[in-house]
């Protein structure tokens, strides 16, 4: 398969394309992106016949910022009414064998209108795939994706376990907790699930730890720590939710998040303040370089244009400051499903 299809948040197609172009060229793959504004996906076309499939097998999905899902595809498949399954199955015979098949769309209002058609197609597609021998249990880690554009066209692609999301449409859906102070609480919940490895979860998020939440009010991010039994120093001039304060785990300090300094090293620093991204990046680097925290999760609020370039600038700035301070660290950046015009960064000191 020569091309790559990447799912992304609607409105972030150019940023997704800019990132993939840089990543692909760094590995010796060159082509061009087909970008339709607000489509919720991009298609990157390469010159080499097998470039798409080869590239995705070389990528680390967790290092991609704007991609929700990434699959290798060929050209669009035209579908005829009454013959959609047959058209897709014919194309599937040219793909590697797979252990499962997913039927998806972009995350847009227009695409949601296809949900009825997808439900009708799911059973006959799965049965057709099994009957033809395209699905095999031995094809471990290989998945086929039918990406429906409308009732008359679709992409058919393949993904590999080493570089993909394990959630349909690349979306990790979370339920808003009844006691949550604000919907922003879902951002940090998703960030923990995305960034904190399951094997180190108990060590990284342990009852009795202390976290600082800059710009905490009304307590959406603080809530995620409190429900894990972690103490929080909440920094904000605004009011905190009364129920959070009654837990006895929250110390509310009315102060400027950019001026506050902790009295001792804390286990976590989190920040969702609305401020220029470079200013937040410099503040986070200051905390880590000063030894005030060993772990940080924060959001960078992005401009309307050249968002990938802005993220790159922030990361380079932090890298320079931390290198100068002799801090060894690892990081991840992701445009999470519950993020909007922002990306979430996690940095942990080694």
From Swiss-Prot:
Annotated positions binding S-adenosyl-L-methionine: 184, 217-220, 236, 256, 272
The keyword Membrane belongs to this UniProt entry's keyword annotation: no
GO biological-process terms attached to the record: methylation; rRNA processing
Catalytic-site annotation from UniProt: 301
GO cellular component, one term: cytoplasm
EC number: 2.1.1.186
Main location: cytoplasm
Catalytic reaction list: cytidine(2498) in 23S rRNA + S-adenosyl-L-methionine = 2'-O-methylcytidine(2498) in 23S rRNA + S-adenosyl-L-homocysteine + H(+)
Alphabetized UniProt keyword annotations: Cytoplasm, Methyltransferase, rRNA processing, S-adenosyl-L-methionine, Transferase
SUPFAM superfamilies: S-adenosyl-L-methionine-dependent methyltransferases
Compartments (UniProt record): Cytoplasm
Pfam families to which the protein is assigned, alphabetical: FtsJ (PF01728), RlmM_FDX (PF18125), RLMM_N (PF21239)
GO molecular function, one term: S-adenosylmethionine-dependent methyltransferase activity
NCBIfam families found in the cross-reference section: PRK11760.1
Protein family per UniProt: Belongs to the class I-like SAM-binding methyltransferase superfamily. RNA methyltransferase RlmE family. RlmM subfamily.
Subunit structure: Monomer.
Function: Catalyzes the 2'-O-methylation at nucleotide C2498 in 23S rRNA.
Protein name in the entry: Ribosomal RNA large subunit methyltransferase M
